[in-house]
Amino acid sequence: MSEPKGRGAAWTEERGTSDKGPPPQAARQARRRLESGPAASGKGSAPEASELLALPGAVEASWPDEGVAAHYGDPMREQRAAEQSAAIVDRSNRGVLRITGQDRLSWLHSLTTQHLEGLAAGQAAQALILSPTGHVEHHLTLADDGTAVWVHVEPGTAAALAEFLESMRFMLRVEVADVSQDYSVLTVLGPAGDDLAAGLDAVAARVSPGPFGSIDLIVARDLLPEVAGDLLRRGAAAAGMWAFEALRIAARVPRLGLDTDHRTIPHEVGWIETAVHLNKGCYRGQETVARVHNLGHPPRRLVFLHLDGSADRLPAHGDPVELAGDDPGDEHRAAVGFTGSAARHYELGPIGLALVKRTVPVDATLLAGGVAAAQEVVVPPDAGGGVQVTLRRRQFL
C-alpha cells in the first residue's frame, strides 16, 4: 500500500463544530485546498476530493485511492474498531452506475459471469465482465432495489464500463447512467455495523453483504457528510483506506487492478467461487471459464504472504516475486509472480497478496520485492480440472 499524500484538514470545537461529523464550511474549504493542488492541473483524472477529508486527522490516500482518507491518525486503532465494533470507510472515489428498465436483470445476466435473473430486491452480488478470451475486465459489486440495479466499481473504471454496457443495449428496455459525480460509496464494517446502519433514511441503496462482510451504502454525494456524521454519532469510528486494505488483504479478498493484471482469469484469484455462476447460460468469455474449470488448471494462483516483520518497508505493487532459494547474486533470477497488495495489519503484522505461477511449491519461501515472505495457499494448485475446492480464506466477521 502506497504512502499517503500527507494532506489533511481538521476542524475544532473552537470553531463551534462537532467532532462527530464534518461541518459543511470546513469540508468545502478542505475540498478547495485539495482541488488547488497538483491534481487540479488537468494532468490525469484524479477523483474529486471527499468532503470527509475534513474529519479530524484525515490524511489523503495516494494511488489508487486518491480523494479519500488513508487514515485519521491511528490506522491500527481504526482496524481494531472495524473488526471488534463498527467503523465507516469513505470509499467515495469508487465509480457508481445506476441501471434501470424492465430488462435490466436479464440483460446483466447475459453479459456478466453471475446469475442475476430473479435477483431479489436488496440481495447483493458480485459479477465480472470478461474479455472474449476470458480475461477479467471489470469487477462489479451490485444490488437491485426493486426499480434499479446499483453497481459500484474500482475508481476510474465507471466510464469505460458504462460505455461497454451502452454498446450492448440494442433494443432492450434498459438505461445506463454513470452517476459517480452524484453518488458515493460509504462502507460500514464490524459486528455492530448492521445495527448502526439500520434506519438510515438518506441512503439511496444498500449493497450487503459486500465482498468480505461489509455493508456498502450508496449515498447522494451532497448527503455524505450528513450520513457519515449520523453513523459517527451512533458510535462508529472513522477508518481510512489503510485500515480497509489491511482487513481486505487479511480476508484474502483480491482487488481488481492491484491483485490482477490484464491476463487474469477468474480462477486465478478465487472469483470462480464468489463472482462466477458455473451453470448459467452463455456470456462473453465463458468458453475459457468452462474449459479451465472442467479440463485444466489456471496458470497462476493467488497466495497470502506473511512478510518479514524486520524489514523497514513493504513491497510495492508490481514488485517481482521470486523463490527465496535462488542465488541472490544472480541478476537474472526469474520472477515467479508479482506482488499485488501489501499492508500492515494490527495483529498479523506486514501482510500481502501475490499472484504466482501454479507450479511454485506451496511450501516455498518467497521474496516479494526483496522482502522475505512465507506463503499461505488461497487458490490451490489443483483448482480447476473438475476439482471442487474450497478457498483458504480468513473469516472477517
Predicted feature descriptions by range:
Residues 121-124, 203, 252, 257, ...:
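Glycine-centered loop/turn motifs
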Residues 1-126, 130, 135-137:
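Acidic, proline/glycine-enriched N-terminal capping motif
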Residues 2-3, 8-12, 19-23, 272-276, ...:
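Glycine-rich, small/acidic residue-mixed loop/short-helix segments
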Residues 218-306:
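Anionic-ligand-binding alpha/beta catalytic cores of soluble enzymes and soluble regulatory domains
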Residues 96, 138-254:
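Acidic, low-complexity central loop/insert segments
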Residues 75-84, 125-139, 169-172, 197-205, ...:
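Short amphipathic beta-strand starts and helix->beta connectors
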Residues 109-117, 163-171, 229, 233, ...:
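Short, intrinsically disordered, mixed-charge
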Residues 88-110, 175-191, 297-308:
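Short glycine-/aliphatic-rich beta-strand segments at the starts of folded cytosolic domains
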